[in-house]
Amino acid sequence: MTYGRIGHTYNHNLSITGGTENIKYSFSYAHINDKAIMIGSNFKRDNFSLKLNTKPSKRTTIDLQVRFSDTKVRGGGANDAKGSYNTDKRLKDAVIYPVIPLKGLDEANTSFDDSDMNIFDPITSAADNDEKKQNKNFNMAGAFGWEIMKNLTLKTEFGYDYYTMYDQRYYGLTSYQARNYADQAFADHPLISLDNDVRERFRNTNTINYDFKNLIKNKDHILNMLLGHEYIITKEHENINQIVGFPKTYDAATAWRLSSQGTASGTSDFYSP
Protein backbone atom coordinates (compact mmCIF):
# COMPACT_ATOMS: atom_id res chain seq x y z
CA MET A 1 0.00 0.00 0.00
CA THR A 2 1.11 3.58 0.59
CA TYR A 3 4.01 2.70 2.90
CA GLY A 4 4.64 -0.78 1.56
CA ARG A 5 7.38 -0.04 -0.94
CA ILE A 6 10.85 -1.43 -0.30
CA GLY A 7 13.08 1.56 0.35
CA HIS A 8 16.82 1.95 0.08
CA THR A 9 19.45 4.58 0.68
CA TYR A 10 22.76 4.84 -1.18
CA ASN A 11 25.61 7.05 0.02
CA HIS A 12 28.81 7.72 -1.91
CA ASN A 13 31.66 9.88 -0.64
CA LEU A 14 34.95 10.90 -2.23
CA SER A 15 37.61 13.05 -0.59
CA ILE A 16 40.98 14.17 -1.94
CA THR A 17 43.47 16.26 0.03
CA GLY A 18 47.05 17.25 -0.61
CA GLY A 19 49.50 20.07 -0.92
CA THR A 20 52.98 21.36 -0.26
CA GLU A 21 54.50 23.86 2.11
CA ASN A 22 52.99 26.79 0.20
CA ILE A 23 49.76 25.31 -1.11
CA LYS A 24 47.06 23.11 0.40
CA TYR A 25 43.95 21.83 -1.31
CA SER A 26 41.01 19.56 -0.62
CA PHE A 27 38.14 18.28 -2.75
CA SER A 28 35.10 16.34 -1.63
CA TYR A 29 32.03 14.88 -3.29
CA ALA A 30 29.02 13.38 -1.52
CA HIS A 31 26.01 11.71 -3.11
CA ILE A 32 22.86 10.43 -1.45
CA ASN A 33 20.00 8.64 -3.18
CA ASP A 34 17.06 7.80 -0.95
CA LYS A 35 14.07 5.81 -2.14
CA ALA A 36 11.46 6.18 0.60
CA ILE A 37 9.05 3.45 1.63
CA MET A 38 6.15 5.77 0.75
CA ILE A 39 5.06 5.33 -2.83
CA GLY A 40 6.14 8.16 -5.14
CA SER A 41 8.65 9.68 -2.69
CA ASN A 42 12.36 10.01 -3.49
CA PHE A 43 15.25 12.21 -2.43
CA LYS A 44 18.55 12.79 -4.21
CA ARG A 45 21.39 15.18 -3.42
CA ASP A 46 24.89 15.86 -4.79
CA ASN A 47 27.41 18.02 -2.93
CA PHE A 48 30.72 19.29 -4.31
CA SER A 49 33.32 21.20 -2.30
CA LEU A 50 36.73 22.60 -3.21
CA LYS A 51 39.08 24.44 -0.87
CA LEU A 52 42.43 26.01 -1.73
CA ASN A 53 44.94 27.81 0.52
CA THR A 54 48.10 29.24 -0.97
CA LYS A 55 51.01 31.45 0.08
CA PRO A 56 52.43 32.91 -3.15
CA SER A 57 55.05 34.92 -1.28
CA LYS A 58 56.30 35.52 2.22
CA ARG A 59 53.85 38.38 2.79
CA THR A 60 50.77 37.32 0.80
CA THR A 61 48.07 34.65 1.15
CA ILE A 62 45.21 33.59 -1.13
CA ASP A 63 42.26 31.47 0.03
CA LEU A 64 39.47 30.12 -2.16
CA GLN A 65 36.46 27.96 -1.38
CA VAL A 66 33.75 26.75 -3.78
CA ARG A 67 30.67 24.70 -2.93
CA PHE A 68 27.81 23.41 -5.06
CA SER A 69 24.75 21.37 -4.13
CA ASP A 70 21.96 19.93 -6.26
CA THR A 71 18.91 18.58 -4.41
CA LYS A 72 15.93 16.83 -5.97
CA VAL A 73 12.80 15.90 -4.01
CA ARG A 74 9.86 13.97 -5.41
CA GLY A 75 6.52 13.31 -3.73
CA GLY A 76 4.08 15.52 -1.86
CA GLY A 77 2.50 12.83 0.31
CA ALA A 78 -1.14 11.91 0.73
CA ASN A 79 -1.89 15.14 2.55
CA ASP A 80 -5.06 17.18 2.53
CA ALA A 81 -5.14 20.91 3.19
CA LYS A 82 -7.85 20.91 5.82
CA GLY A 83 -11.29 19.69 6.64
CA SER A 84 -12.92 17.64 9.37
CA TYR A 85 -15.20 14.73 8.64
CA ASN A 86 -17.04 12.35 10.90
CA THR A 87 -14.75 9.54 9.73
CA ASP A 88 -11.57 11.25 10.90
CA LYS A 89 -11.75 10.17 14.55
CA ARG A 90 -12.67 6.58 13.69
CA LEU A 91 -10.27 5.80 10.87
CA LYS A 92 -7.44 5.41 13.37
CA ASP A 93 -9.38 2.49 14.87
CA ALA A 94 -10.05 0.81 11.53
CA VAL A 95 -7.27 -1.74 12.07
CA ILE A 96 -8.39 -2.59 15.60
CA TYR A 97 -12.11 -2.59 14.80
CA PRO A 98 -12.37 -3.52 11.12
CA VAL A 99 -16.07 -4.37 11.46
CA ILE A 100 -17.04 -0.70 11.81
CA PRO A 101 -18.45 0.45 8.45
CA LEU A 102 -16.97 3.60 6.99
CA LYS A 103 -20.09 4.72 5.12
CA GLY A 104 -22.92 6.53 6.93
CA LEU A 105 -21.34 6.47 10.36
CA ASP A 106 -24.20 8.38 11.98
CA GLU A 107 -27.78 9.26 11.24
CA ALA A 108 -26.99 12.95 10.77
CA ASN A 109 -24.94 12.15 7.68
CA THR A 110 -27.14 10.58 5.04
CA SER A 111 -24.46 10.61 2.35
CA PHE A 112 -23.14 7.23 1.28
CA ASP A 113 -20.56 8.67 -1.10
CA ASP A 114 -16.96 8.05 -0.07
CA SER A 115 -15.90 11.33 -1.69
CA ASP A 116 -18.19 13.23 0.68
CA MET A 117 -16.63 11.39 3.59
CA ASN A 118 -13.10 12.25 2.41
CA ILE A 119 -12.26 8.57 1.99
CA PHE A 120 -10.08 7.70 -0.99
CA ASP A 121 -7.69 5.00 -2.06
CA PRO A 122 -4.42 6.05 -0.33
CA ILE A 123 -2.36 5.27 -3.43
CA THR A 124 -4.61 7.52 -5.52
CA SER A 125 -4.48 10.18 -2.83
CA ALA A 126 -0.67 10.12 -2.86
CA ALA A 127 -0.59 10.42 -6.66
CA ASP A 128 -3.07 13.33 -6.50
CA ASN A 129 -0.83 15.29 -4.11
CA ASP A 130 2.39 15.09 -6.07
CA GLU A 131 5.38 17.41 -5.97
CA LYS A 132 8.70 17.71 -7.77
CA LYS A 133 11.25 20.16 -6.41
CA GLN A 134 14.84 20.94 -7.37
CA ASN A 135 17.20 23.24 -5.47
CA LYS A 136 20.61 24.33 -6.71
CA ASN A 137 22.99 26.29 -4.53
CA PHE A 138 26.38 27.67 -5.60
CA ASN A 139 28.71 29.40 -3.13
CA MET A 140 32.10 30.91 -3.79
CA ALA A 141 34.30 32.74 -1.28
CA GLY A 142 37.80 34.10 -1.57
CA ALA A 143 40.28 36.18 0.38
CA PHE A 144 43.58 37.93 -0.30
CA GLY A 145 45.89 38.96 2.52
CA TRP A 146 48.95 41.19 2.28
CA GLU A 147 51.33 42.13 5.06
CA ILE A 148 52.35 45.53 3.73
CA MET A 149 54.88 46.03 6.48
CA LYS A 150 55.51 44.57 9.87
CA ASN A 151 52.29 44.66 11.96
CA LEU A 152 50.30 46.27 9.10
CA THR A 153 48.02 43.87 7.21
CA LEU A 154 45.58 44.46 4.39
CA LYS A 155 42.86 41.91 3.67
CA THR A 156 40.10 41.79 1.07
CA GLU A 157 37.34 39.18 0.98
CA PHE A 158 34.55 38.44 -1.44
CA GLY A 159 31.64 36.02 -1.58
CA TYR A 160 29.07 35.08 -4.20
CA ASP A 161 25.92 32.99 -3.67
CA TYR A 162 23.54 31.82 -6.39
CA TYR A 163 20.40 29.89 -5.46
CA THR A 164 17.62 28.52 -7.65
CA MET A 165 14.48 26.64 -6.68
CA TYR A 166 11.87 25.18 -9.01
CA ASP A 167 8.86 23.67 -7.28
CA GLN A 168 6.06 21.94 -9.18
CA ARG A 169 2.89 20.93 -7.32
CA TYR A 170 0.04 18.84 -8.66
CA TYR A 171 -3.41 18.50 -7.14
CA GLY A 172 -5.50 15.70 -8.62
CA LEU A 173 -9.19 14.89 -8.49
CA THR A 174 -9.18 13.60 -4.91
CA SER A 175 -7.20 16.53 -3.48
CA TYR A 176 -8.84 19.17 -1.31
CA GLN A 177 -7.71 21.94 -3.66
CA ALA A 178 -9.37 20.39 -6.71
CA ARG A 179 -12.60 19.37 -4.97
CA ASN A 180 -13.09 22.75 -3.28
CA TYR A 181 -11.82 25.18 -5.92
CA ALA A 182 -13.70 28.48 -5.65
CA ASP A 183 -14.62 28.73 -9.34
CA GLN A 184 -17.10 25.91 -9.95
CA ALA A 185 -16.25 25.91 -13.64
CA PHE A 186 -12.84 24.47 -12.73
CA ALA A 187 -13.79 22.51 -9.61
CA ASP A 188 -13.17 18.76 -9.70
CA HIS A 189 -10.42 19.23 -12.28
CA PRO A 190 -6.67 18.83 -11.72
CA LEU A 191 -4.60 21.96 -11.11
CA ILE A 192 -0.90 22.72 -10.73
CA SER A 193 1.27 25.34 -9.06
CA LEU A 194 4.68 26.33 -10.47
CA ASP A 195 7.11 28.25 -8.25
CA ASN A 196 10.43 29.49 -9.65
CA ASP A 197 12.76 31.36 -7.28
CA VAL A 198 16.20 32.80 -8.12
CA ARG A 199 18.43 34.61 -5.60
CA GLU A 200 21.86 36.21 -5.94
CA ARG A 201 24.08 37.66 -3.24
CA PHE A 202 27.46 39.36 -3.53
CA ARG A 203 29.59 40.44 -0.57
CA ASN A 204 32.87 42.34 -0.43
CA THR A 205 34.89 43.29 2.64
CA ASN A 206 38.12 45.30 2.78
CA THR A 207 40.02 45.80 6.03
CA ILE A 208 43.36 47.13 7.18
CA ASN A 209 44.74 46.17 10.56
CA TYR A 210 47.65 47.60 12.53
CA ASP A 211 49.10 46.10 15.70
CA PHE A 212 50.70 48.65 18.08
CA LYS A 213 52.70 46.05 20.01
CA ASN A 214 55.98 47.69 19.00
CA LEU A 215 54.80 51.03 20.38
CA ILE A 216 53.22 49.67 23.54
CA LYS A 217 56.01 47.63 25.02
CA ASN A 218 53.94 46.11 27.76
CA LYS A 219 52.86 42.48 27.77
CA ASP A 220 49.80 43.33 29.86
CA HIS A 221 48.30 45.63 27.21
CA ILE A 222 47.32 45.05 23.58
CA LEU A 223 46.15 47.66 21.10
CA ASN A 224 44.97 47.01 17.55
CA MET A 225 43.39 49.37 15.04
CA LEU A 226 41.02 47.97 12.41
CA LEU A 227 39.55 50.02 9.59
CA GLY A 228 37.39 48.72 6.79
CA HIS A 229 34.13 48.62 4.95
CA GLU A 230 31.68 45.99 3.73
CA TYR A 231 28.90 46.01 1.20
CA ILE A 232 26.35 43.37 0.28
CA ILE A 233 24.19 43.25 -2.84
CA THR A 234 21.18 40.93 -2.84
CA LYS A 235 18.75 40.28 -5.68
CA GLU A 236 15.74 37.97 -5.85
CA HIS A 237 13.07 37.13 -8.40
CA GLU A 238 10.25 34.74 -7.58
CA ASN A 239 7.51 33.79 -10.03
CA ILE A 240 4.49 31.72 -8.97
CA ASN A 241 1.83 30.51 -11.41
CA GLN A 242 -1.33 28.55 -10.74
CA ILE A 243 -2.94 26.74 -13.66
CA VAL A 244 -6.35 25.08 -13.34
CA GLY A 245 -8.95 23.27 -15.41
CA PHE A 246 -6.86 20.42 -16.80
CA PRO A 247 -8.66 17.42 -18.32
CA LYS A 248 -9.59 14.89 -15.65
CA THR A 249 -7.36 12.25 -17.24
CA TYR A 250 -4.18 14.29 -16.68
CA ASP A 251 -1.75 12.97 -14.11
CA ALA A 252 1.11 15.00 -12.60
CA ALA A 253 3.67 14.32 -15.34
CA THR A 254 1.19 15.17 -18.11
CA ALA A 255 -0.03 18.38 -16.45
CA TRP A 256 3.51 19.62 -15.82
CA ARG A 257 4.57 18.83 -19.36
CA LEU A 258 1.43 20.24 -21.05
CA SER A 259 0.79 23.26 -18.84
CA SER A 260 -0.63 25.20 -21.79
CA GLN A 261 -3.66 22.88 -21.78
CA GLY A 262 -4.90 24.46 -18.55
CA THR A 263 -6.19 27.93 -17.69
CA ALA A 264 -4.00 30.43 -15.83
CA SER A 265 -5.81 31.51 -12.67
CA GLY A 266 -3.16 33.47 -10.82
CA THR A 267 0.36 34.83 -11.21
CA SER A 268 2.67 36.37 -8.64
CA ASP A 269 5.89 38.13 -9.67
CA PHE A 270 8.17 39.30 -6.86
CA TYR A 271 11.34 41.32 -7.39
CA SER A 272 13.79 42.44 -4.73
CA PRO A 273 15.08 45.04 -4.84
Task: Report the location of each language-model feature.
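Structured alpha-helical segments in the cores of large, soluble enzyme domains
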Residues: 12-18, 269-273
